[in-house]
């Protein structure tokens, strides 16, 4: 994946690094790479999403 950052003439290195970091975080490159390291079956992925949702509902009902 490529991150293209346009640098204006006379712009400081710190400013350019800040732009790069923000763009990197928005692109979620690290998360995508970690997900692609191993194959997860669609059924397992759905099960994981459902368990997270149930846990969130449990926390909400517990606090109410």
UniProtKB/Swiss-Prot annotation:
Molecular function terms, GO-annotated: structural constituent of ribosome
GO biological process, one term: translation
InterPro entries: Ribosomal_bS21, Ribosomal_bS21_sf
Keyword annotations of the record: Ribonucleoprotein, Ribosomal protein
GO CC annotation terms, alphabetical: ribonucleoprotein complex; ribosome
Family indicated by similarity: Belongs to the bacterial ribosomal protein bS21 family.
Protein known as: Small ribosomal subunit protein bS21
Organism of derivation: Karelsulcia muelleri (strain GWSS) (Sulcia muelleri)
